[in-house]
């Protein structure tokens, strides 16, 4: 249990950041899910549009520290490869 005022404030800040990060992570997952649906349906146009929405969202999450930048880059790369395979 936090006893000092600074420790209590740190607990409040951590709780607030956790909520923000949860929201960002959920938003990324939603965008990825939409892309997955487009890929599974085989809709090239929808997949490209969804990918263009997913990429900046993932990179934004990386820049905010929600996911590691290498993790975001890896996910973007794998999704791009799947979108490209759909177009081939």
UniProtKB/Swiss-Prot annotation:
Signal sequence coordinates: none
Origin superkingdom: Bacteria
GO biological process assignments: translation
UniProt keyword list: Ribonucleoprotein, Ribosomal protein, RNA-binding, rRNA-binding
GO cellular component terms listed in the entry, alphabetical order: small ribosomal subunit
GO MF, one example: small ribosomal subunit rRNA binding
Family to which the UniProt record says this protein belongs: Belongs to the bacterial ribosomal protein bS20 family.
Function: Binds directly to 16S ribosomal RNA.
Official protein name in the record: Small ribosomal subunit protein bS20
Protein's organism: Brucella canis (strain ATCC 23365 / NCTC 10854 / RM-666)
